[in-house]
Curated annotation (Swiss-Prot):
Its EC number is 3.1.26.5. Coiled coil: none annotated. Pfam families: Ribonuclease_P (PF00825). InterPro entries: Ribosomal_Su5_D2-typ_SF (IPR020568), Ribsml_uS5_D2-typ_fold_subgr (IPR014721), RNase_P (IPR000100). This is Ribonuclease P protein component. One of its GO terms (biological process) is tRNA 5'-leader removal. Transmembrane segments: none annotated. It comes from Gluconobacter oxydans (strain 621H) (Gluconobacter suboxydans).
Amino acid sequence: MKKRPQFLRVAGKGRKVATPGMVVQILPDDTATETRVGFTVTKKVGNSVIRNRTRRRLREALRLVAREDGLPSGDFVLIGRDKTRERDFSLLKDDLRQALRKGLGVNFRESPRGPSGKGRDQAK
């Protein structure tokens, strides 16, 4: 997503879930054939170098979570916070998973991997 009206539509009609590392706005759409994602980091976070680093961290966290857990169709906006750039990356991914789980409810499936990164049977 790149256009302001798209972001405003998600903000107005979607659900908003805040975590320590980010804010996620979610507008699920079962009829859509694609998933659209937008990233926002305001000037409160810092100068352009810091904002771009924050945006890159959000983009990579989403890429990894989507690859591991899948992502349903709809529109998503990830809003970076001050803590996004300093937060441990594994915690940032957990924040994103938590926000998606809370915002999507039963539509979002949990990862079959345990905390160690191994399958459920091997995590013991």
